[in-house]
Structures are given as C-alpha cells and as structure tokens.
Design a protein with these regions (language model features):
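Internal "kinase-insert"/substrate-recognition segments embedded within catalytic cores
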Residues: 146-147, 163-180, 184, 205-210, ...
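Sec-dependent signal peptide recognition
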Residues: 2-9
Length: 516
C-alpha cells in the first residue's frame, strides 16, 4: 500500500509545482528533498493520509523553520512595538516537516515562503537579542500574501505576477491545513501529554476539538550554526478555521459561521452576557489596537448578517430565568452537555465555564450552535493546585474573573436547581467520568510521546539563556519552564501528577453526584 502511495505522489509531482517531498530510509538530509511536487497536492487523494500521519502520536515529528535573521528580528520588533496586539506575519524561507514512522521509515515534506509570527495574549514576551534567548509561541500561515499596505512597509511588500498566482497562495494548504500553531511547554507539564490527552478526550466523546501532537522544533536562522538549533519539544495544534469545519461537517452543513471568542476585547470578556450587536462581527483592529469585538467572525465575512449569533445572544439574555427546555432550538444539546462535563472533569480553569475564555462557536446552516474548546493547556492538574480544580464540585459557581463574569447561559441552565439541563449535565459527568479520568488511556498517550521524544527535550540552540525549573511560581509563570526529561512525576507546588488529579477528582464525583 505504501509503495502505491509513493507512486501516486510521483505521478502528481510531474503535473504540479510548489511544495516538495522526499521518502527515504534513515537519511533525512534536506539535500534529498525533491522540489518538484505541486503547489497544492495536499488537496488531492492523499490529503487526509498526511493529516492523519501528522497527528498520529505513534509517529515522530520534526518541524524545521528556515528564516533569515532580519525576519526573526522583525518578530521581536513587532512585540516591542505592539505587545500582544502585533499579529504581523514575517517571511520564513521554508518550513520542512519530517515524519518518522514506527518502522523507522521517514517522509520529508517542504513548503516555501510561509508566514510566521508570535502567538498568544499574556504569554508574549521578548525573545530575541542577537539570537533566541527565550521560548515563545508561534503561529505559522501557509496562505499569507505579504501585500497588505496597512501592515508592511513598501520595501516589504510582495508583488504578485497575477491575480491567479495570488489567489493560489490564499488557498494554499500543507498537510491539508492552512496554518499551524506551535506552543512551548509554558505550563511545566513534564508529561508533555495533558493537553494532547484533553483534545483526544473531547473528540472521543463527540465534541469537536483541534487535533494536537508533539514535535521537535528546529530553527535555522540565516544558515548560521551559532544561532540555529532545536528549541526542544513544542506542541503542534490544528487551527480551528474554515478547513476544520469542512473536515468535520458534511458538505450540506459546512458553510456556516465560525466565531472565535476573543480575550481582551474592547467590548468585554466573551461571557455571552450581552445582546449588543457591537460585541460581534469581523475584528478590524490594527497592530497595537485592542480587539474590536468579543466574537470575531472567521468565515463568511462578507455575506453574513450575524443573525444566528444575534438570535443566540437574545435568547440567552431574555427575561427568562430557566432556558433549559429551549436549548436544542439554538444549541446542539448533546455536545454542549458533554463539553461542560469534560470541562469540569478535566479541571480546565482557563475555559468558558471558569474563565469565560478559549472557545469557538460554529453556527451550522440551520442556525444551530456548536461550541468547540481550544487551548487546553491547563487541564488534568496543570497549574491547578492553587485554583482548587481537583476538589471543585460539579455545581460550584466558580469563575476566575469574578461572579459577574459567569455566563448567563450557565446561570439559566446548569445552575438552575432541578432543571432538565442540570440533570443531564450531572448524568453525563457520572456516565463518562471513569472514561475521562482514566489512567490507562492517559498513559497510552504519554508512552507514545515518551518513546518518541525522551532524548529530544533539551534544546540545542546555543544562545538560549534558559535554566531548569523544578517548580512554577507566579513570577516566572510564562518564562523558561523546561526540563530535560519526560516523566509522569510532574508534581510541583502548582501541578498535580495525572494520577493525583484523577484520584481526587473521581472521589469528588463519587461523593457529590448522588447528593444533587
């Protein structure tokens, strides 16, 4: 089957141009990468095979970014000038992904002229001074055109030979994706497994969530060995975007409206506690400006009249104190209840329920809303000892931002004593708790990661001014929290081990569910 797959790729390479590939046994050198494969062959027959291979934990992934020193300096300059509101993509010459399969067979894929920028909200910080000095999160775009006069200086603008060529770039994909998100281990998760496991659990129980895996990040800066090397292990995330929707919904229902709940908007936290039409739309903020909306439309930007989100917000913020019986008119009820149950069981304090944060809403073509989590890096005991997440009860009304920020959607459904949604929520927790809080399933994820990467944790970039951290405190929360090992014993003053966490959480579930 694999030989047939290679033959298909070879035939396609004769017809197309723009990306590259190589298959080999043991030799991954960049010199062996064939530069003849097509501009968008990932939209052909084998797209999903490559996508699946990228996120298969049994496979070992290495991502290599080739970038000029002048361009990586611009990423630092953008942070210094704009802080967390500087989402300007800079040019990387190429990105190469190497997949090593369990049988040691390797495949190498390369794409040229990509966009790269810093990612995050409060996690952004200075990282470059005559070399990479600190870890940061990155966002990679395969579709950036670099021709927006509002963002780029005249000398930086790319001139496209034709509208067709520019349109091809705007539709270009790699591994069936338009972008990638790369995050370092900011939370000090020495298992490197908890948010990978969280995304897997959501999908297992029918909630749409981004695919997540682990890989080695290699930065080649100006072909200078003194500046280049690995940044150790990074988490690799599938973005939630129009391609994600088309991959996960049938053709007759995948052209709806996708909104991102934005943190730090000028219109307030995305609590769903407003009817205001000014809270939603297309974010038109420029670098350095606060985001202009709380719910940022990511698809159908030109044709949407925002009626679906308006209907949802008007319903949630009506005068009714109990809207449980009407949930299915506006929301996919089953996945909504499961989403809430897993949020509780995973102890994720940086989500919709506990922090009014980190969720998307997709309105399908009939107007029904599907909630989708993302950024699940504070789950299953990560940074949760001081939040009490292992011992919080299913109906506790905790919100990190204060009581006023608890969503009216929660207040009028699971908070209503004896309501139909509260009953279903508690039943769902009881039903899935042993499957979510499952040591065997977690360790399957962990040992796939451990076996592939146990010797690759320590970065090799010489300029990194990094120290080994054995704990996390509030002052160094987002700084160089890195160890040179992968271990199940990741307990600190702020982190529970997975075993500690699930033991306490299951005890709380068993003691409390029957009392409500």
């Amino acid at each position: 089957m694999r030989k047939f797959f290679i033959l298909l790729l070879t035939l396609l390479s004769i017809l197309l141009h723009g990306c590259s590939f190589d298959f080999n046994n043991g030799d991954n050198s960049e010199n062996n990468v064939d530069n003849t494969l097509g501009k968008d062959y990932y939209d052909e027959l084998h797209t999903e095979n490559l996508y699946d291979d990228l996120f298969d934990l049994k496979n070992k992934i290495e991502i290599k970014v080739n970038i000029k020193e002048t361009e990586i300096k611009k990423i630092e300059e953008d942070f210094q000038k704009y802080g967390s509101e500087g989402n300007i993509y800079r040019v990387a010459d190429s990105l190469q992904i190497t997949i090593t399969y369990p049988d040691s067979y390797t495949s190498v894929y390369k794409i040229e002229d990509i966009g790269i920028r810093m990612k995050g909200n409060t996690s952004r910080h200075s990282f470059y001074n005559n070399g990479i000095r600190d870890f940061i999160h990155f966002k990679i775009s395969f579709q950036e055109t670099f021709d927006d006069e509002k963002l780029y200086k005249k000398s930086e603008l790319i001139s496209w030979d034709s509208l067709e060529e520019r349109e091809n770039r705007k539709n270009r994909t790699f591994f069936g994706l338009r972008a990638l998100e790369l995050k370092y281990n900011a939370e000090g998760d020495l298992t490197y497994s908890k948010d990978v496991y969280a995304s897997k659990i959501y999908r297992e129980y029918g909630v749409l969530a981004q695919q997540t895996t682990i890989g080695i990040l290699n930065m080649n800066i100006g072909n200078k060995s003194s500046l280049s090397g690995t940044l150790g292990l990074y988490k690799i995330y599938e973005p939630l975007d129009r391609i994600f929707i088309k991959r996960n919904f049938p053709k007759n229902n995948n052209d709806g409206e996708l909104y991102k709940a934005t943190w730090g908007s000028a219109k307030g936290m995305p609590t769903l506690n407003t009817k205001s039409s000014k809270s939603y739309g297309v974010d038109d903020s420029m670098p350095g400006e606060t985001k202009s909306v709380s719910y940022d439309l990511k698809t159908n930007k030109k044709k949407s009249n925002h009626q679906n989100i308006s209907n949802l917000l008007n319903w949630i913020n009506s005068s009714s104190k109990d809207i449980s019986n009407e949930v299915s008119k506006y929301i996919d009820e089953d996945s909504f209840i499961t989403w809430l149950a897993i949020m509780y069981l995973s102890g994720d304090w940086d989500n919709f329920m506990y922090d009014s944060n980190n969720f998307f809403m997709y309105f399908d073509e009939s107007g029904i809303c599907y909630f989708m989590p993302f950024d699940m890096d504070r789950t299953f005991g990560l940074l949760s000892k001081h939040r009490g997440m292992a011992t919080i009860k299913p109906l506790d009304k905790y919100n990190l931002q204060g009581d006023n920020n608890r969503s009216n959607l929660l207040k009028k459904t699971i908070d209503v004593k004896g309501s139909v949604i509260q009953k279903k929520y508690l039943e769902r927790i009881k039903e899935i708790s042993t499957g979510v809080l499952n040591k065997d399933k977690f360790e399957e994820v962990y040992y796939n990661i451990y076996n592939n990467y146990k010797d690759d944790v320590r970065p090799t970039i010489q300029t990194l001014e990094y120290r080994y951290e054995t704990d996390v405190d509030q002052n160094t929360f987002y700084h160089l929290i890195h160890e040179e090992l992968i271990t199940l014993n990741d307990s600190t003053n702020y982190n529970y081990t997975y075993s500690e966490y699930i033991k306490q959480k299951q005890r709380i579930v068993d003691r409390n569910i029957g009392w409500y």
